[in-house]
A protein has these predicted regions:
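Short Fe-S-cluster ligation motifs
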Residues: 53-73
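Flexible loop residues that form catalytic
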Residues: 38, 70, 115-116
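Canonical radical SAM enzyme core domain
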Residues: 40-53, 72-106, 110
């Protein structure tokens, strides 16, 4: 599994500080998706040792490990989701698909689904087609992102 890089984000999973991993290989080609900018960026191998070392460095600073993609590498993704849970982190997957395999879903705490459609907007738009779910409770948390939308100028 290859990735573009990792980062710490505050707003991509409600009530969590997340360490993100942007995984190489999405083939959905959603119009205006931020992934388009990443296609020419350098990539790195995300083996289990590097993954474990990286998330352990952030222990106590982040509460969730978030994968932007990776469902196209199900066995590797599942292995990393299990490692994250074993180390006490919650897990999240952002996918452009409408659903993911049950074998992946059972290792997630949160899941964002749906392609990015520019005319509908992303999660911060009330008209979005995307959904953000707490997998454990089944609660749809999408509306929590709407308060993050920039105010419209009059």
């Amino acid at each position: 599994m290859r990735y573009y890089g990792s980062d710490v984000v505050l707003a991509d999973v409600p009530d969590e500080i997340s360490l993100t991993f942007s995984i190489v290989g999405c083939r959905l080609n959603c119009s205006a998706c931020f992934w388009q900018e990443l296609r020419s960026a350098p990539t790195y191998e995300l083996d289990d040792e590097l993954f474990t070392d990286t998330i352990q460095r952030y222990r106590g600073l982040v509460s969730c490990v978030l994968f932007y993609g990776g469902e196209w590498h199900p066995l590797e993704l599942i292995r990393k989701l299990k490692l994250a849970h074993q180390l006490g982190f919650k897990t999240c997957l952002y996918t452009g698909l409408s659903r993911v395999k049950d074998s992946i879903l059972k290792h997630l705490d949160y899941l964002k689904t749906g392609t990015y459609q520019e005319k509908l907007g992303g999660l911060s738009s009330p008209t979005t087609n995307q959904k953000f779910i707490n997998v454990n409770s089944g609660e749809d948390l999408t509306a929590q992102f709407w308060q993050l939308a920039p105010a419209k100028r009059k």
